[in-house]
Amino acid sequence: MSARAAAAKNTAMEETAIWEQHTVTLHRAPGFGFGIAISGGRDNPHFQSGETSIVISDVLKGGPAEGQLQENDRVAMVNGVSMDNVEHAFAVQQLRKSGKNAKITIRRKKKVQIPVSRPDPEPVSENEDSYDEEVHDPRSSRGGLVSRRSEKSWARDRSASRERSLSPRSDRRSVASSQPPKPTKVTLVKSRKNEEYGLRLASHIFVKEISQDSLAARDGNIQEGDVVLKINGTVTENMSLTDAKTLIERSKGKLKMVVQRDERATLLNVPDLSDSIHSANASERDDISEIQSLASDHSGRSHDRPPRHSRSRSPDQRSEPSDHSRHSPQQPSSGSLRSREEERISKPGAVSTPVKHADDHTHKTVEEVVVERNEKQAPSLPEPKPVYAQVGQPDVDLPVSPSDGVLPNSTHEDGILRPSMKLVKFRKGDSVGLRLAGGNDVGIFVAGVLEDSPAAKEGLEEGDQILRVNNVDFTNIIREEAVLFLLDLPKGEEVTILAQKKKDVYRRIVESDVGDSFYIRTHFEYEKESPYGLSFNKGEVFRVVDTLYNGKLGSWLAIRIGKNHKEVERGIIPNKNRAEQLASVQYTLPKTAGGDRADFWRFRGLRSSKRNLRKSREDLSAQPVQTKFPAYERVVLREAGFLRPVTIFGPIADVAREKLAREEPDIYQIAKSEPRDAGTDQRSSGIIRLHTIKQIIDQDKHALLDVTPNAVDRLNYAQWYPIVVFLNPDSKQGVKTMRMRLCPESRKSARKLYERSHKLRKNNHHLFTTTINLNSMNDGWYGALKEAIQQQQNQLVWVSEGKADGATSDDLDLHDDRLSYLSAPGSEYSMYSTDSRHTSDYEDTDTEGGAYTDQELDETLNDEVGTPPESAITRSSEPVREDSSGMHHENQTYPPYSPQAQPQPIHRIDSPGFKTASQQKAEASSPVPYLSPETNPASSTSAVNHNVTLTNVRLEGPTPAPSTSYSPQADSLRTPSTEAAHIMLRDQEPSLPSHVEPAKVYRKDPYPEEMMRQNHVLKQPAVGHPGQRPDKEPNLSYESQPPYVEKQANRDLEQPTYRYDSSSYTDQFSRNYDHRLRYEERIPTYEEQWSYYDDKQPYQPRPSLDNQHPRDLDSRQHPEESSERGSYPRFEEPAPLSYDSRPRYDQPPRTSTLRHEEQPTPGYDMHNRYRPEAQSYSSAGPKASEPKQYFDQYPRSYEQVPSQGFSSKAGHYEPLHGAAVVPPLIPASQHKPEVLPSNTKPLPPPPTLTEEEEDPAMKPQSVLTRVKMFENKRSASLENKKDENHTAGFKPPEVASKPPGAPIIGPKPTPQNQFSEHDKTLYRIPEPQKPQMKPPEDIVRSNHYDPEEDEEYYRKQLSYFDRRSFENKPSTHIPAGHLSEPAKPVHSQNQTNFSSYSSKGKSPEADAPDRSFGEKRYEPVQATPPPPPLPSQYAQPSQPGTSSSLALHTHAKGAHGEGNSISLDFQNSLVSKPDPPPSQNKPATFRPPNREDTVQSTFYPQKSFPDKAPVNGAEQTQKTVTPAYNRFTPKPYTSSARPFERKFESPKFNHNLLPSETAHKPDLSSKAPASPKTLAKAHSRAQPPEFDSGVETFSIHADKPKYQMNNLSTVPKAIPVSPSAVEEDEDEDGHTVVATARGVFNNNGGVLSSIETGVSIIIPQGAIPEGVEQEIYFKVCRDNSILPPLDKEKGETLLSPLVMCGPHGLKFLKPVELRLPHCASMTPDGWSFALKSSDSSSGDPKTWQNKCLPGDPNYLVGANCVSVLIDHF
């Protein structure tokens, strides 16, 4: 203070001395150090004044401080550490340890002229102020301002003004002293040292400057110079500037200030501190420090760079985008980035880049560069060292020539850099002799020089920054490029290197491990090759931080950028060259599978038929988009400076476009399409010219485009970055309902549109910027669509760093075909109103009006999904065919790439550890198989080929291949062409190929990538089969027979086998996929139900069953035939049954659930597809190769026989099951003689035994688990049936050893459904071997229907399920169990459908389960609950597939009838689960003999693993069962549900949800004899048995099921709540009801909440029909028994309470919001939430559906709670 006092001694009255504050960054120079000497300190006061300040006593000439610091400057801070009242040694130490750079804040006396002399206090206050400011300045400028700026652009202005105000702070002090009317000069001299001045100083905050056009300027109530007395009610007296800034920042958009006018403007008359305003101008070094805070981290940096930067900036626009991208990404990994940035700050080079902020665009060049680095590294880093920034800046300013950039920098930096620069010339010898460090973010440095090399002799040394080599600028080049450039120089060539000595910067770079930093977007799919690698799908963004990982070429170290641009995980990815190679292989390999030649012949053969042609086109369109992007696209995060075009995909995309353009013409305009030039394309489709889009954009409107995915990719390439919205359909029926309501005149096929949507999603989901789940019950999608478009428009976009080739040209005529126009299927619409039009949404080739030429297959085919052509074919066949084609194309052209990319995320998460990259790839291609089945009739070969390609990669077993070959013939779906099919099939046949296919299937089908991944991992094999490949695969595995059988059956029942198969497959796929997929779960259910219905009615379902059945058998048979196949088929078979209890095939042929029943194969296939994947995953865990095989065969098994699929699984691990399966076959044979033989083959006793023996393997797959579940369900009724069937059909299974085709046909029609049920039961039974004994029971049951038996059977299934869960818990079994559990529900579904279809012993039993399930299912369908079932599937896959994902499980307890259970679990581990499935198998074995005991025993283990294991199984099962069966099952089932009620009553049911499942099973067995009603309950519950607690709730529901059915039929009636609904759960031993809330609501809505638990249900007005008083309740439970199946392998953990909502079956006209508290604090980053909901009437865990939370508008994950929109209980 003495200094300040001294300052007051101004000689002239009008002249006053003030203390200016400056912040300077010094760079240590060799021989100079910082070039300053300091004196003073607490222990060394001034000899005269006694001042203890640290004072600059000397500044060396030519040193770093010259021109920046002056003698007598008071040092206020060094590197943010206050130097006030410190000892001299401390100050010296701070300078020494500051390394290469020191940020020094000094106070300098300055004389100013003031109208009135100022009193002494003012200077004092000034000083204090300045000190205050100093403290603030460093902090704020360093961290606060910068980080703020980066975080919010709006803060930029404020921060700038703040910064200015910072320096004014010193001025502020004058305010404090402004009280005296006139400035007065005061001099106080101490007579002795210890004398005090007696002053108490205060500071004021005042308005230093108001920026133009700001809020404050417009308001006019604040003027510059006003003293701020209060900020938002807080008094500012003695408040530091930093605190004031913080207060303002926390104002959250509303700032209240109390200010006092300074009429005399005393404060304003104080000259600006150079610090504040100058820094902003970057006119002074000091200012630089200030600017640094303003612009970003380093004012110095920004200052130095601005000039230079402006120069370089323009050339290198990348920096700016980079800045942006860095900005957001940096936030993600703020920790590492920050530390890195700080280090950088210490180093000039590193710091400079990080310093700049995108927000500081004002500093244009310099700042941009800095920002770029900053963002990359850590925008939060407040201030990199200015000098370093300069050093780094040249790096940033790549565009500018190095010398230019460098020289300006050096001049800016006191010319320190200039003298250190050197120009070295020498001739290259064998090598340049240099090792390089650094990268594009900090500059390229010499890390080592070879002794005696020419470079060493010329004076290059370690630590030199290379600015230029041979006129090539090295300032912004990545390290890998720099190394390659030097390596590529020819020997003997003269090398000219411009370098600069920056050893200190170099050291910092080495210490902080910084170098490269740039962002890339991937355009291919990759499976990590090492534990440290990162797998990725298309469209993912990474920040690359080291392009020469470990000093070797080939790998890059990268950080994955997740949601909200946060950095999620770091790992190794291939370098650019390898990526290009992998991408090219990915694009061509699939083609080889199909083969260009094969395609040519295939399409040529199709020319005669327009329909076929359309199919072929669809095939191609289903393929992933062929992109023009490189494997890695350099991107930056930027705002869209224009209204982005909007592309809408989905079944009602045409309606959405027209509605937007009609209702909001000022915002949206449809881009008109033009006919293509003659000869360009024979297709009738039109094109949209980029010029047309540009005209609309120029009008400030969104251009609505009706284009194909390929066109979207081209738009992205042209940097138009369209907003791509995918309207995700809930179900086929939902699509039909919506289109009837929205566009009744439309002639488009809802089925085709639905299937096309699935294919599109599978192949091109990476193109979607947002997805909206459609609810057929309302038109909420429209508001969500507009909101999504607005949100996307306002979001930052990852855009290409460079310009696209020709993208800038207006006409974009570079590639007339690609850039000058976009294919517009919509335009085709106008020309053709045929069904094919629906494809317009997705594909160019969608129209089939024009003559077909081979050319048509070009890119447009890839774009469009070739489903429309199939419309002509029967529904079942059409779907299959479509899927097949689309899928196939994907596989073929680009299966690995697109499908892989889509599925891979799922793969990636679980599959990396679990499977090989190839496997994953195979999985990725799996979706193609899916399509392939669809296309099967027309282009099955291509589909198969794709599968094959994938298969080749993954499957090991060639044996399956032969079978696969058969598949192409028998099942065109499987293989588009026989040749391709054979090749493909062979590869496919091995477990791995199958695996591959499933992945693809998943990708295409599942909407949520996460879920997809999970599916892949957990049940990739199964998925492949059930999903896409199932049709193909199963056929492939036992292809020749099963396909044939299926085809024959199809032909007999439906249409040509091709069509039927194809259709079936497609349906399956879409449905299955849907179910599995995140949201589609519900929708698929819905569709499946309808589908089944239709199938049943037409009797086609039977054929489907036949086909499927044979497949199933085949699959078993196949496993027997070949070890590879044998093991695989088991997996395969269980998977199909597992999920739906029926093979997926049936369902696909019949897109409707009914079909599923009748044709369990298609329906189950669909479901199973997902399940199988999960199962296969489990299996994979235990034995990678076998699981792969299983996958391959499994999918086939699925396709061949959904029921069988289960059987196969059963067979896999249960000989008994095999026998049991046979009995179902026998019933089938009854329907059809062929069925029996088919069954015999597929279900030979030996395979069953083998399966049983292989139980563990199966269990790992999770398919096994599912099978167990189904077994439990069926054990009572089904097992008896099975016994009968077994007896009759056991021999047929033996026959099954023969080619599956013939035998399959026989059993397929009816037996398949029965078989499905049986299979499920059998599978469960086989798990334990006791089931063998059980099969007789099943047989008996099949002969007669007994509700008790049904209940018992369901109970058994439950117990199996529980057991499985238990087994899963202990080991890898968990995944299997999970899957198995879902299978149970599926089985129930099959049963239900089957029952409906045929009145066999099984049928009754199936009916019982179906009732409970069906009811629930039905409701979900109506309410669009089917999607939740899908989530279940999805969740299940996700569990297996995702290493860590949060699963929020919503469990609607159908049986309970009380409501939904929702739980949140986190998935973490993937591979560990496979082992538990084997355990599960054993429990399953126990189960058949003594279900109750088994259940109990397993129950406890389940409890130990309840969350994970049960969750998985339950999820999948529930999804499948609930959606399809519930919907279909008629009221009779409801009565069945009542028996469930009894079941729930049973204590075991009550206590287990997951464990309870186990309990349930025992309950069933014990209660079945004791109380038929109870058994019935259990049976009904069997599908959802996984959650015992749910079951309890269901007991109440048992009564409710009827209501449910009624409810479905008549919404207006209130659904009664049975007293037991609320009470029973509590009574149950298995779970504890923590809280119960109930209330009566009417049309006005309301809130039902539980304060203790934080759970609440918000019922909006209009959710309940008018005139209805509806009682609603929910119970919050803590019960392992009813927990959703958590996938331990995925590391799922329950994060939220389990909530059971009721009454079950209640549907809302508007979605109600269920809020669940959760503890997933890490959710936003690496964790993934999965919502698991059970819609089963029984509340079975098996019916847990996975609902996708991320990105789903129906689910909102907050910091402490998850909000879920549900439309039914």
From Swiss-Prot:
Homodimer. Forms heterodimers TJP3. Forms a heterodimer (via PDZ2 domain) with TJP2/ZO2 (via PDZ2 domain). Interacts with OCLN. Interacts with CALM, claudins, CGN/cingulin, CXADR, GJA12, GJD3 and UBN1. Interacts (via ZU5 domain) with CDC42BPB and MYZAP. Interacts (via PDZ domain) with GJA1. Interacts (via PDZ domains) with ANKRD2. Interacts with POPDC1 (via the C-terminus cytoplasmic tail). Interacts with HSPA4. Interacts with KIRREL1. Interacts with DLL1. Interacts with USP53 (via the C-terminal region). PROSITE patterns: GUANYLATE_KINASE_2, PDZ, SH3, ZU5. Belongs to the MAGUK family. Residues 632-875 are annotated as: Occludin (OCLN)-binding region. The modification Phosphothreonine is found at T184, T266, T353, T808, T845, T847, T853, T860, T867. It is found in: Cell membrane; Cell junction, Tight junction; Cell junction; Cell junction, Gap junction. Keywords: Calmodulin-binding, Cell junction, Cell membrane, Gap junction, Membrane, Phosphoprotein, Repeat, SH3 domain, Tight junction. Gene3D superfamilies: 2.30.42.10, 2.60.220.30, P-loop containing nucleotide triphosphate hydrolases, SH3 Domains. The lineage of its organism: Eukaryota, Metazoa, Chordata, Craniata, Vertebrata. This is Tight junction protein 1. The 244-aa domain between residues 633 and 876 is the primary occludin (OCLN)-binding site and is required for stable association with the tight junction. Residues 1300-1310 have a biased composition (Pro residues). Residues 102-188, 295-362, 824-976, 1010-1067, 1091-1212, 1224-1261, 1273-1589 are annotated as: Disordered. It comes from Canis lupus familiaris (Dog). Phosphorylated at tyrosine redidues in response to epidermal growth factor (EGF). This response is dependent on an intact actin microfilament system. Dephosphorylated by PTPRJ. The modification Phosphoserine is found at residues 125, 174, 177-178, 211, 240, 274, 276, 279, 283, 289, 293, 296, 299, 322, 328, 333, 336, 352, 616, 621, 809, 820, 823, 827, 836, 911, 967, 1070, 1138, 1365, 1412, 1546, 1618. Residues 515-583 form the SH3 domain. Residues 102-112 have a biased composition (Basic residues).
